[in-house]
């Protein structure tokens, strides 16, 4: 690569895309990498402020930005992602299907600390739809040493930095608890809310019951849902507070399920319970009343991970404290907001 005056560039091969920016009109490459400069191009180049140009001068020890972006893209990409054509030295990845985005933050920081290169991603543990943008990759200079890119590739290993996990759970049970609902004193308005949320992920409710605040009944219903009705996840509503009549946490514990956490540093949703039942680790969740009336709660944060069979730990739930406060915005933009970005 060498630098020459634009007026002297006729017949030279451009090393990179040249971008024209007109506010509110366009931001695109007016000439692409590999273009052979023609006499009529000179006025156009000068009009976009290019009085000097980098033109190609072969050097086998260096990689062009487009080729380096391809390496960074390969470091990130898994099988459920589509890549954009390289443009202005940048490649972007988009979701090829709905799923849960996972980001290896440790290795991502390694790449971005290496110098002269960058990968920018969405937050990990974010639910995404088909076509959603996931990341962008490029190097900072126009050229970079081949050896440097090879070292980065070797350090990152064979596992992609990004994973897009499909939603595997398709069948759920909803157990509404509470004497007031069981005896018909009030209508069960919790179950329809959960059915609507589950439908967003194409999850079918295969078993639903309204139960009294009797631990033995709730325990039996959880086991029936899993062992007889084929539920791959059980949602228990109500009975999650410290009131003497609220017995749902005890009922879940009595199934023998492994309790991950009773309580979460998230508002709304502090009285949330997460557990896993049996060898297949079927998720059994205790949902506080806020899930019924608040637009977004801890349930919305945990649900995509549960559906993707991505086991949640107590430490990860604890990490939700930073960013765990929903601001209850007048217009909700979740997940395109700061809520739940702590893990």
Name the predicted role of every residue range:
Residues 1-88:
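Short, low-complexity N-terminal leaders and the immediately following helix N-cap/first helix
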Residues 7-11, 29, 83-86, 126-128, ...:
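Solvent-exposed alpha-helices and their adjacent loops that cap or buttress functional pockets
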Residues 29, 85, 100-119, 126-129, ...:
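C-terminal terminal segments
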Residues 32, 38, 43, 123, ...:
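Residue-level recognition of short, solvent-exposed, well-ordered loop/turn junctions
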Residues 55-56, 81-86, 144-146, 204-208, ...:
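Flexible, glycine/charged-enriched surface loops at secondary-structure junctions
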Residues 59-167:
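Extended, charged alpha/beta regions that create polyanion-binding interfaces
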Residues 158-213, 217:
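Glycine-rich phosphate/diphosphate-binding loop of Rossmann-like nucleotide-binding domains
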Residues 179, 206-339:
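Short glycine/threonine-rich loop/turn motifs
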């Amino acid at each position: 690569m060498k630098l020459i005056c634009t007026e002297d560039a006729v017949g030279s091969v451009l090393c990179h895309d040249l971008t024209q920016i007109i506010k509110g009109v366009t931001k695109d490459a007016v000439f692409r990498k590999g273009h052979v400069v023609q006499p009529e191009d000179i006025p156009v180049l000068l009009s976009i402020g290019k009085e000097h140009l980098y033109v190609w001068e072969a050097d086998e020890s260096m990689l062009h930005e487009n080729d380096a972006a391809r390496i960074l893209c390969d470091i990130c990409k898994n099988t459920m992602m589509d890549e954009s054509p390289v443009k202005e030295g940048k490649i972007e990845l988009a979701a090829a299907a709905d799923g849960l985005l996972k980001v290896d933050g440790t290795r991502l920081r390694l790449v971005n600390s290496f110098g002269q290169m960058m990968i920018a991603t969405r937050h990990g543990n974010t639910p995404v739809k088909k076509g959603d943008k996931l990341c962008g990759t490029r190097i900072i200079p126009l050229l970079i040493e081949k050896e440097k890119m090879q070292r980065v590739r070797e350090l990152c290993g064979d596992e992609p930095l990004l994973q897009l996990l499909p939603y595997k759970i398709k069948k759920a049970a909803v157990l509404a608890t509470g004497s007031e609902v069981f005896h018909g004193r009030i209508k069960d308005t919790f179950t329809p809310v959960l059915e609507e949320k589950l439908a967003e992920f194409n999850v079918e409710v295969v078993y639903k019951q309204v139960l009294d605040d009797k631990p033995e009944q709730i325990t039996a219903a959880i086991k029936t849902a899993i062992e007889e009705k084929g539920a791959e996840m059980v949602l228990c509503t109500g009975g999650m507070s410290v009131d003497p009549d609220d017995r749902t946490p005890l009922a879940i514990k009595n199934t023998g399920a492994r309790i991950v956490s009773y309580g979460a540093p998230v508002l709304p949703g502090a009285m949330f319970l997460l557990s896993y039942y049996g060898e297949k680790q079927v998720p059994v969740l205790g949902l506080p009343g806020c899930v019924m009336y608040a637009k977004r709660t801890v349930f919305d944060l945990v649900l995509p991970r549960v559906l993707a069979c991505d086991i949640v730990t107590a430490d990860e739930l604890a990490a939700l404290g930073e960013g765990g406060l929903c601001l209850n915005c007048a217009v909700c933009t979740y997940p395109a907001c700061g809520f739940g970005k702590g893990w």
